[in-house]
Design a protein with these regions (language model features):
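Surface-exposed interaction regions that form or flank ligand-binding interfaces
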Residues: 1-65, 73-77, 88-91, 98-281
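Conserved beta3 VAIK motif of the Hanks protein kinase fold
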Residues: 80
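Cell-envelope/extracellular polymer assembly enzymes that use nucleotide-activated donors
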Residues: 68
Length: 281
């Protein structure tokens, strides 16, 4: 290694230290993500023939939204909002009153939560603006950890996965022809970024043109990729790619970055600040 290359590597290393990382993940958000993971695991176990897309990204001129889980089963579509709210839940005037008992102080704490039914209804409305196909969407709110639930409307909701999967199997509006599958195919699931530093994660949409790797005289595009793991060194990253067809690639990148769309805004994040990427496509 020449003296010029040595100082170049030193400079690159210090530049990498100051690169942008993904935002801090709150404990509440992390707790909710774990709940979604557990929910999807149970759904796949009880409905092995269903198709699932997580964290459907919706970006329209009228607003942005996200649907936690979209399930396709026997030509029926189910949009599911997952709420991992503990304690006692009471619907009141279009909102939810959440009361939790503090196990350390033995005191009750009250919090007003927005209606997940309204949240899901808005998301479905915007999704119909984004997707050109026409299909019936059955809406369901799933409460994962509540001790007691009091709801006085006719919206569909569940608090145990067994009743929910039974409902999906035996109920729900069926879409005409192949419309449900066509609609499902157009829905965009979020990509997932993860950083070991402070256990940070982000659901977003990676811009297609920022995730292309030239390897052995070919270009591996975002649409080809399933997952990416990144091993960090002082002046470069060892990027390990697993393609959808099972092929594995590895490439060293000095100071790479990706661009993502998150809630309608574009951000740049350095690969040196990421450890794992899961593509939702």
């Amino acid at each position: 290694m020449g003296i010029g290359e040595f100082f170049h590597k030193i400079g690159v290393g210090f530049t990498r230290l100051g690169e942008n990382s993904i935002p801090h993940t709150t404990q509440a958000k992390r707790y909710g993500n774990w709940g979604e993971d557990e929910f999807v695991y149970h759904i796949r176990t009880h409905l092995p023939n269903c198709q699932i897309k997580r964290n459907i990204v919706i970006q329209t001129l009228e607003g942005n939204a996200e649907i936690d889980c979209l399930i396709l089963y026997n030509n029926k579509l189910f949009a599911i909002e997952i709420k991992r709210w503990k304690g006692e839940l009471t619907e009141c005037d279009g909102q939810f009153v959440q009361r939790k008992l503090d196990r350390w102080t033995d005191e009750w704490h009250t919090k007003i939560q927005k209606s997940p039914f309204r949240q899901l209804s808005r998301a479905i409305y915007l999704l119909r603006k984004q997707v050109t196909e026409k299909a019936w969407i059955n809406s369901i709110v799933y409460f994962e950890d509540a001790d007691r639930i009091s709801i006085n409307n006719k919206n569909t909701w569940f608090d145990n996965v067994y009743s929910l999967t039974e409902y999906i199997q035996n109920n729900g509006q069926v879409s005409y022809g192949n419309n449900a599958q066509a609609f499902f195919n157009q829905c965009i699931p979020a990509d997932y970024l993860y950083s070991n530093s402070w256990d940070k994660s982000l659901h977003c949409v990676i811009c297609d043109d920022s995730l292309a790797f030239r390897i052995s005289n070919k270009v591996v595009h975002k649409s080809d990729i399933s997952t990416i793991s990144i091993e960090h060194h002082w002046s470069y990253d060892e990027v390990k790619i697993e393609a959808k067809n099972g092929t594995r690639y590895a490439v060293n990148i000095e100071n790479g970055s990706i661009y993502v769309i998150d809630n309608g805004y574009k951000y740049r994040y350095a690969l040196c600040k990421l450890d794992y990427i899961h593509l939702g496509n």
